[in-house]
């Protein structure tokens, strides 16, 4: 099949392929016409072959009749064969000698078959031992591959652990630096790391007592309804403050860091005044203690997240 020539334009290419398609269609029609003629001729030949088959069958019948006649002639010839009996006796003697040779060859063949069976048995045992050795070798290869994979995984885990330790050390250093340089907002200092640890320890100590909270030196039964209400109030206040902080960040995204540090406390104070974090709820001593702890924790989280804005570190891949 010849390769298509280079074309100067799409119209030339379309014209070329249209001509080729017409040519192929014409060839297809010619071939189809020839095929139809061939089918018609084959049908005619089939009819002729059927006629010749009938003729041949009649000829076969005639030949069978002749065969029966020749068989009768053969029987007459058998009578002539009896005269050759002497020759047949000689041939029988020779046949006896051949039979003896055949018996000796049978014995030798039987011995060869026994030897062949022994060799096949030994070969089968050898193949089984080879298969066992191959299975043991495959198991050893698999065990070696698993050990190599474990070694590689151990190396990757060690590298990942080292990266995590380095990142933990950097985060600790950054936290120490931020805890040393905490700014003052509207005359109120932001809780430092020690204050955070104090609040967390108080929350943990209160959470570690499921049936009671220490208040004024006495163990008081915990009010589940008041604690649930305080938690919902704190979460709602946190959500409202976070929404207000997002709106503030969108409006003042082009300001400098110094202006942002001065404006955020005022914006947060206005939002805090509009949405009180801890509404006045008259509860028992246990409820007030839970409300105060939850409120302190929410206030510290909001102030620290608005002022400092910690950078998001890239996750370890």
UniProtKB/Swiss-Prot annotation:
Primary subcellular site in the record, as a coarse category: cytoplasm
Q: What happens when the gene is disrupted?
A: RNAi-mediated knockdown results in multipolar Class I dendritic arborizing neurons forming a bipolar morphology. Dendritic arborization is unaffected.
InterPro entries according to UniProt = NUDE, NUDE_dom
- Record GO biological process: axonogenesis; border follicle cell migration; cell division; cell migration; centrosome duplication; centrosome localization; chromosome segregation; dendrite morphogenesis
**Record-linked Pfam families:** NUDE_C
State a GO cellular component annotated for this protein.
Answer: spindle envelope
Stretches for region Disordered: 186-205
One Gene Ontology MF term? microtubule binding
UniProt keyword annotation of Ion transport present: no
The record's keywords, sorted A to Z, are: Cell cycle, Cell division, Coiled coil, Cytoplasm, Cytoskeleton, Microtubule, Mitosis
* Compartment(s) where it occurs, according to its Swiss-Prot or TrEMBL record: Cytoplasm, Cytoskeleton; Cytoplasm, Cytoskeleton, Microtubule organizing center, Centrosome; Cytoplasm, Cytoskeleton, Spindle
- Taxonomically, the superkingdom here is Eukaryota
Q: Does the keyword Chaperone apply?
A: no
Coiled-coil-forming residues are 29-180
Q: Which PANTHER family match?
A: NUCLEAR DISTRIBUTION PROTEIN NUDE HOMOLOG, NUCLEAR DISTRIBUTION PROTEIN NUDE HOMOLOG 1
Family, as annotated: Belongs to the nudE family.
Protein's job: Chaperone protein with functions in nuclear localization. Required for centrosome duplication and formation and function of the mitotic spindle. In postmitotic neurons, acts with nudC downstream of dar1 to ensure correct positioning of the nuclei in primary dendrites and as a consequence, is required for determining multipolar neuron morphology.
State the protein's name: Nuclear distribution protein nudE homolog
Species this chain originates from? Drosophila melanogaster
């Amino acid at each position: 099949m010849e390769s298509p020539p280079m074309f100067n334009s799409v119209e030339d290419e379309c014209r070329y392929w249209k001509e080729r398609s017409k040519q192929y269609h014409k060839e297809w029609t010619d071939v189809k016409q020839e095929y139809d003629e061939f089918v018609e001729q084959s049908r005619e030949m089939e009819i002729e072959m059927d006629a010749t088959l009938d003729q041949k069958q009649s000829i076969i019948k005639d030949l069978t009749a002749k065969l029966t006649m020749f068989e009768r002639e053969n029987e007459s010839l058998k009578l002539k064969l009896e005269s050759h009996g002497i020759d047949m006796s000689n041939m029988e003697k020779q046949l006896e000698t051949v039979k003896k040779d055949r018996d000796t060859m049978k014995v030798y063949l039987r011995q060869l078959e026994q030897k062949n069976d022994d060799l096949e048995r030994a070969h089968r045992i050898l193949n089984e031992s080879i298969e066992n050795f191959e299975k043991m070798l495959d198991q050893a290869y698999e065990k070696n591959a698993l050990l190599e994979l474990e070694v590689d995984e151990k190396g990757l885990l060690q590298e990942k652990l080292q990266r995590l330790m380095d990142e933990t050390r950097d985060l600790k250093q950054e936290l120490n630096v931020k805890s040393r340089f905490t700014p003052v907002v509207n005359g109120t200092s932001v809780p430092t790391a020690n204050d955070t640890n104090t609040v967390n320890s108080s929350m943990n100590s209160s959470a570690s007592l499921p049936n009671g909270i220490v208040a004024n030196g006495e163990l008081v039964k915990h009010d589940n309804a008041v604690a649930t209400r305080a938690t919902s109030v704190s979460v709602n206040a946190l959500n409202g403050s976070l929404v207000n902080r997002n709106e503030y960040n969108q409006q003042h995204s082009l300001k400098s860091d110094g202006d942002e540090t001065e404006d955020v406390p005022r914006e947060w104070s206005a939002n805090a005044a509009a949405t009180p974090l801890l509404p006045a709820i008259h509860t028992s001593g246990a409820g007030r203690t839970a409300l105060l702890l939850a409120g302190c924790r929410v206030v510290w989280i909001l102030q620290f997240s608005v002022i400092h804005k910690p950078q998001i570190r890239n996750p370890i891949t």
